[in-house]
Curated annotation (Swiss-Prot):
Oligomer and partners: Interacts with CYTH1 and SNX27.
Superkingdom of this protein's organism: Eukaryota
Chief location bin: cytoplasm
UniProt-annotated location(s): Cytoplasm; Early endosome
Taxonomic placement: Eukaryota, Metazoa, Chordata, Craniata, Vertebrata
Source species: Rattus norvegicus (Rat)
Protein name per its UniProtKB record: Cytohesin-interacting protein
Keywords: Coiled coil, Cytoplasm, Endosome
Keyword presence, Coiled coil: yes
Length: 359
């Protein structure tokens, strides 16, 4: 009350000589007659200081001007008046912003379009302004339908308090980009994990789980066919104990092998195939009539070699084929003469051309 009494005494004299101390150094010294507006401002300042605690009096005086400028720059009140059959000339849109710090969302209604030469454009409404108050009613937490009903019930005169929504609009754009980046990161992470699993399968040779290796096995089986050894049904049969059964198997092997000699296969695949056949062949030759079957097999092999020596055999095939019958005698041949003869065989080169055309 002492400050108010001092101000009243000085205002009654018509002059104000007030010099601020170090705490109020930002305020200039006022001299001369005061107007009614100045007296009103001084009275408001005195009332504000009198109601605040002592520790916050200086802080309130220091920030009073900045708060006033901030509120004036962020908030504005616009009055829009339209004709009876006319429109206000603006469109609104409601956004729901997700708060990252707390599990809540904020709803704000902002102007998305303003028509030129409309009452809203003439009143000063801009795109991006956010509704804070409509006809004295706060729109905080209102849905889009509630805001529309409030505007329609106002009649021809509409008083809107708006906020500058540039930062909020920018925040909404950044939130949308953040969600897009999160989804992209999730997809890339799944792709990275799948590539890592494929790499581990290829490095450790896990053919059961690797699709590439499964396709390779299927292609290999389709290419080589019967050359990979006896079928599982053949392995399930009882052991060969008679001469006729062993001869029939050898004859079928000779006929099938003559048809398949033209196929170009790798040396490792042939060796692996005949290594699986060796166990079955050994079981056949250790039967009760082993010596007689061995002589018949050697004579049949010599006849098949003499018949097909004109072009179906190759040195690699003969060496692998004779490895099945390890005890059979082999004829010595000159390698150089055979290589020259194989150059003129058309059937051998035709198989190679067919294999290249598949790829």
């Amino acid at each position: 009350m002492s400050l108010q009494r001092l101000l009243q005494q000085q205002s009654s004299n018509g002059n104000l000589e007030y010099c601020a101390d170090s705490a109020y150094s930002s305020y200039p010294t006022l001299t001369g007659p005061l107007t009614v507006e100045d007296n009103r401002r001084i009275q408001m300042l005195a009332d504000t200081v009198a109601t605040l605690p002592r520790g916050r009096k200086q802080l309130a005086l220091a920030r009073s001007s900045s708060l006033g400028d901030f509120s004036c720059s962020q908030r504005k009140v616009v009055t829009v008046e339209k004709q009876d059959n006319g429109t206000f000339g603006f469109e609104i849109q409601t956004y729901r912003l997700q708060n990252q710090n707390i599990c809540s969302s904020e709803v704000c209604t902002m102007i998305c379009k303003v028509q030129e030469d409309s009452p809203a454009h003439c009143a000063g409404l801009q795109v991006g302004d956010i509704f804070a108050n409509v006809n004295g009613v706060s729109t905080e937490g209102f849905t889009h339908k509630q805001v529309v009903d409030l505007i329609r019930s106002s009649g021809n005169l509409l008083t809107i308090e708006t906020l500058n929504g540039t930062m909020i609009h920018r925040r909404a754009e950044l939130e949308a980009k953040l969600q897009t980046l999160k989804q992209t990161l999730k997809k890339k992470w799944v792709e990275l994990r799948s590539l890592h699993l494929q790499e581990q399968r290829l490095l450790h040779g896990d053919a059961a789980n690797s699709p590439n290796l499964e396709n390779m096995n299927l292609d290999e089986s389709s290419l080589f066919g019967n050359l990979l050894g006896p079928s599982p049904a053949f392995l399930d049969r009882p052991r060969l104990s008679s001469e006729s059964s062993c001869k029939s198997w050898l004859s079928s092997l000779t006929v099938d092998s003559e048809d398949d000699y033209g196929t170009s296969v790798s040396e490792d695949s042939i060796r692996g195939a005949f290594s699986r056949q060796t166990s079955t062949d050994d079981e056949c030759f250790h039967s009760k009539d082993g010596d007689e079957i061995l002589r018949n097999a050697s004579s049949r092999r010599n006849r098949s070699i003499s018949i097909t020596s004109s072009g179906s055999f190759s040195p690699l095939w003969e060496s692998n084929y004779s490895s099945v019958f390890g005890t059979l005698p082999r004829k010595s041949r000159r390698g150089s003469v055979r290589k020259q003869i194989l150059k003129f065989i058309p059937g051998l080169h035709r198989a190679v051309e067919e294999e290249e055309s598949r790829f």
